[in-house]
Amino acid sequence: MKEKLIQAYMDTAERFAELSHARRLHVGAIVVKDDRIISIGYNGMPAGWDNNCENIVGYTKGEPVLKTKPEVLHAESNAIAKLARSSESGRGSSIFITHAPCIDCAKLIYQSGISSVYYRNSYRDMAGLEFLTKSGIEVTKTE
């Protein structure tokens, strides 16, 4: 894939990340196949729930300490769920994610048939990237 397209798709994922109501981290994902965006997602609460993604678990230096609620859906899982509800197939597609996937999202990416992953920011746990690489999925960190 041409670098110009990679950057355009990654910038688009960043724009969708801005739609997240989370206070700790905004993550966006888009799925692309045959140079078309076939699905999008960003992290947030399930449809119909309130948009408060975190609980305040304490304060440090007067600032709230936030913990993400377990109900929050990751951007990748939202994009893959939307893809599953559509007439499109993920087989042979690419996913562009603002942040490297966690292990659970990496497993969903693999199971959905996505063949390449592009991400911009690292995640605290590399298990997701390691799983994807072991599974034969092309993984690329972009700037």
Q: Where do the language-model regions lie?
A:
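Zinc-dependent deaminase catalytic domain
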Residues: 1-143
